Protein backbone atom coordinates (compact mmCIF):
# COMPACT_ATOMS: atom_id res chain seq x y z
CA UNK A 1 0.00 0.00 0.00
CA UNK A 2 1.27 3.50 -0.77
CA UNK A 3 2.09 5.70 2.24
CA UNK A 4 -0.77 7.85 3.50
CA UNK A 5 -0.75 11.48 2.41
CA UNK A 6 -0.29 13.90 5.27
CA UNK A 7 -3.14 16.32 5.86
CA UNK A 8 -2.15 19.95 5.23
CA UNK A 9 -3.23 22.28 8.05
CA UNK A 10 -1.70 25.56 6.90
CA UNK A 11 0.15 27.45 4.19
CA UNK A 12 2.35 30.34 5.30
CA UNK A 13 3.91 32.83 2.89
CA UNK A 14 6.76 35.00 4.18
CA UNK A 15 9.46 37.24 2.73
CA UNK A 16 12.64 36.85 4.76
CA UNK A 17 16.23 38.01 4.14
CA UNK A 18 18.29 35.09 2.86
CA UNK A 19 20.38 33.40 5.51
CA UNK A 20 18.93 35.66 8.23
CA UNK A 21 15.80 33.88 9.47
CA UNK A 22 15.48 34.04 13.27
CA UNK A 23 12.64 33.38 15.76
CA UNK A 24 11.90 37.10 16.13
CA UNK A 25 8.86 38.59 14.34
CA UNK A 26 7.68 38.08 11.63
CA UNK A 27 8.95 34.47 11.52
CA UNK A 28 8.27 33.37 15.11
CA UNK A 29 4.61 34.40 15.45
CA UNK A 30 3.69 33.19 11.95
CA UNK A 31 5.11 29.72 12.56
CA UNK A 32 4.23 29.54 16.26
CA UNK A 33 0.50 29.78 15.68
CA UNK A 34 0.73 26.69 13.46
CA UNK A 35 2.79 24.78 16.03
CA UNK A 36 5.90 24.48 13.85
CA UNK A 37 9.36 24.06 15.41
CA UNK A 38 10.65 27.58 14.71
CA UNK A 39 14.38 26.89 15.17
CA UNK A 40 14.20 23.85 12.90
CA UNK A 41 12.68 26.02 10.15
CA UNK A 42 15.19 28.84 10.69
CA UNK A 43 18.16 26.47 10.37
CA UNK A 44 16.76 24.77 7.26
CA UNK A 45 15.85 28.11 5.59
CA UNK A 46 19.22 29.70 6.36
CA UNK A 47 21.04 26.66 4.94
CA UNK A 48 18.89 26.68 1.79
CA UNK A 49 19.34 30.41 1.12
CA UNK A 50 23.01 30.78 2.14
CA UNK A 51 24.08 31.46 -1.47
CA UNK A 52 21.65 34.39 -1.83
CA UNK A 53 22.71 36.35 1.28
CA UNK A 54 21.51 39.96 1.36
CA UNK A 55 18.50 39.37 -0.90
CA UNK A 56 14.91 39.02 0.31
CA UNK A 57 13.72 35.53 -0.61
CA UNK A 58 10.00 34.67 -0.46
CA UNK A 59 9.20 31.29 1.05
CA UNK A 60 6.02 29.20 1.03
CA UNK A 61 5.77 26.92 4.08
CA UNK A 62 3.30 24.01 4.06
CA UNK A 63 2.38 22.84 7.58
CA UNK A 64 1.03 19.31 8.10
CA UNK A 65 -1.27 17.81 10.73
CA UNK A 66 1.63 16.22 12.65
CA UNK A 67 3.31 19.68 12.89
CA UNK A 68 5.97 18.82 10.33
CA UNK A 69 6.56 21.21 7.45
CA UNK A 70 8.04 21.56 3.99
CA UNK A 71 9.02 24.80 2.33
CA UNK A 72 9.67 26.10 -1.17
CA UNK A 73 11.86 29.14 -1.74
CA UNK A 74 10.92 31.43 -4.61
CA UNK A 75 13.03 33.89 -6.58
CA UNK A 76 13.54 37.34 -5.00
CA UNK A 77 10.78 39.91 -5.75
CA UNK A 78 11.14 41.64 -9.14
CA UNK A 79 11.19 45.06 -7.47
CA UNK A 80 14.23 44.06 -5.35
CA UNK A 81 16.07 42.72 -8.41
CA UNK A 82 15.32 45.95 -10.31
CA UNK A 83 16.61 48.09 -7.43
CA UNK A 84 19.79 45.99 -7.28
CA UNK A 85 20.36 46.15 -11.06
CA UNK A 86 19.75 49.92 -11.12
CA UNK A 87 21.96 50.44 -8.07
CA UNK A 88 19.40 52.47 -6.12
CA UNK A 89 17.95 52.22 -2.60
CA UNK A 90 14.26 52.71 -3.44
CA UNK A 91 11.93 53.57 -6.30
CA UNK A 92 10.44 56.96 -7.11
CA UNK A 93 7.73 58.51 -4.94
CA UNK A 94 6.15 59.87 -8.14
CA UNK A 95 6.96 57.19 -10.75
CA UNK A 96 5.39 58.92 -13.75
CA UNK A 97 6.88 62.33 -12.97
CA UNK A 98 10.26 61.68 -11.39
CA UNK A 99 12.52 59.05 -12.96
CA UNK A 100 15.21 57.70 -10.62
CA UNK A 101 17.27 55.33 -12.80
CA UNK A 102 17.64 53.55 -16.15
CA UNK A 103 17.82 49.86 -17.01
CA UNK A 104 19.14 48.44 -20.28
CA UNK A 105 17.30 45.79 -22.27
CA UNK A 106 20.02 43.29 -21.30
CA UNK A 107 19.47 43.95 -17.57
CA UNK A 108 15.71 43.48 -17.99
CA UNK A 109 16.30 40.20 -19.88
CA UNK A 110 18.62 38.96 -17.11
CA UNK A 111 15.99 39.70 -14.42
CA UNK A 112 13.23 38.15 -16.56
CA UNK A 113 15.26 34.94 -17.04
CA UNK A 114 15.90 34.73 -13.29
CA UNK A 115 12.20 35.32 -12.43
CA UNK A 116 10.87 33.06 -15.21
CA UNK A 117 9.92 30.08 -12.96
CA UNK A 118 7.71 32.31 -10.77
CA UNK A 119 6.17 34.46 -13.51
CA UNK A 120 2.96 33.72 -15.37
CA UNK A 121 4.67 34.05 -18.76
CA UNK A 122 5.15 31.61 -21.63
CA UNK A 123 8.43 32.99 -22.96
CA UNK A 124 11.24 35.36 -22.01
CA UNK A 125 9.81 38.23 -24.10
CA UNK A 126 6.54 38.13 -22.15
CA UNK A 127 8.51 37.96 -18.89
CA UNK A 128 10.56 40.99 -20.02
CA UNK A 129 7.34 42.97 -20.52
CA UNK A 130 6.21 42.09 -16.98
CA UNK A 131 9.58 43.17 -15.52
CA UNK A 132 9.62 46.37 -17.62
CA UNK A 133 6.13 47.23 -16.34
CA UNK A 134 7.26 46.72 -12.74
CA UNK A 135 10.30 48.93 -13.40
CA UNK A 136 8.14 51.70 -14.92
CA UNK A 137 5.83 51.66 -11.91
CA UNK A 138 8.91 52.26 -9.73
CA UNK A 139 10.08 55.28 -11.74
CA UNK A 140 12.85 53.36 -13.53
CA UNK A 141 13.05 53.91 -17.29
CA UNK A 142 13.75 50.93 -19.55
CA UNK A 143 15.87 51.38 -22.68
CA UNK A 144 15.41 49.16 -25.70
Swiss-Prot record:
Family: Belongs to the universal ribosomal protein uL11 family.
Tagged with keyword RNA-binding: yes
Protein name as it appears in the record: Large ribosomal subunit protein uL11
Molecular function terms from GO: large ribosomal subunit rRNA binding; structural constituent of ribosome
Coiled coil (residue ranges): none
HAMAP family the UniProt entry points to: Ribosomal_uL11
GO term, biological process aspect, one: translation
UniProt keywords, alphabetically: Methylation, Ribonucleoprotein, Ribosomal protein, RNA-binding, rRNA-binding
GO cellular component: cytosolic large ribosomal subunit
